[in-house]
Amino acid sequence: MNDNARLEPVPVDAHDGLLALFHAAPVVALGEAHWLDQQHRLIQELLFDERLAETVDAIVVEFGNALHQPLIDRYLAGDDVAPRQLRRVWSECVGGWFSRAFESPVYAEFFETVRSVRLARRSERPQVLLGDPPFDPLDGVGAVELALGQRDEHFARVVAREVLAHGHRALLVAGSGHLTRRSDVREGNVVQRLEREAPGCCTVVLPHYVFEDVVERRRSDIAKLERKLERWKPPAIAPIRDTWLGEVDATLYLSDTARLVEPDGTEIEIPTPLLDDAGRVLERVSLADVADAYLYLGPIDSLTLAEPPGRAVEEP
C-alpha cells in the first residue's frame, strides 16, 4: 500500500455522519458486529435523536424473524405483548437458531427503545422491518435448512418491496457479510442484490471491529492500522474512497473463513473466500471494494461484547 498516494480520511461525529449519508443514497447499510456494546450504544443514541425519524422511514434488521412482523408491529405501537411471545421475535431467527447469536440483551433493548421513543413522540416512525426469513421451529430441521438458504434473498426482498418501491429511506442493520459490496455468496448478499436492481441505492458502512481469531493472526496489521486511527475521537465516521483506508486488506474485517454451528452444537470452520460478480475467487480485496464509509468506535482492545446470558464464546 502506498500511503503517500492516498488522502487522509476526514472523520466526523458518527451521529451526524451517518445521518448525512442519506443525502447520497436512500439506503444506508450498517454492518453490525454482533453483540458489540459500543455500536449498539450508538444505535440507541440515534434512536433518541429526533433527526433519525425525520430522515428514515424504516430500520430493517437481521435480528428479527419475519414470521413475527405482526407481533412486533403491535408491540411497537404500544400494545401489551407477553415477554415470552415477544422474545420469539429475535430468539427464533434462523440466522442464530443454533448459535443463539441474537439472544444478547442488545437486541431486546433495541426493540424496547424503538417502542419507548415512538410512544413518547406519538409517532409511527421509524418502522421496524424484520429481515430474517419467516421460519417456525416447530416445522423441524428441514425448515431451518430451507430458511438458512433464503436469508440474503429475503432481506433484500423486504427492502425492495417495503422501502425502495415506495421511494422511502431505510437504515439496514445486519452482520457485515450480508451488506458488503463483495461477499462469499455466489448469488449475492443483500447489498449486491439491491444494487443489481437499483444501482447506487446503497451506502455501505463497515465498523472498526476484527474477530478474535483474526486478531490472533494479524496483530501487526491491526497495530499499524490503529496507529493511524489514534487521533480519531470515537464514535466517528469517514468516507473510505480515495483515502489510505481504502487500500486496507478487506479480509482483516471479512475473514476468509467462518465458523458454523451444527445442530448438535459442534462448531466447524469453513473457507469463505470473497467472489467477483462471476463467482470467481478474488485474490486481493481492499476496503474500498467492499464499503463506502468507516465507523470507528474505539481501539479494538477497548471494545466490549454483550454476550447472551450463560454463553461465553470467542466471537459472535
Question: Where in this protein do the model-derived segments appear?
Answer:
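Compositional signal for N-terminal targeting/processing segments
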Residues: 1-316
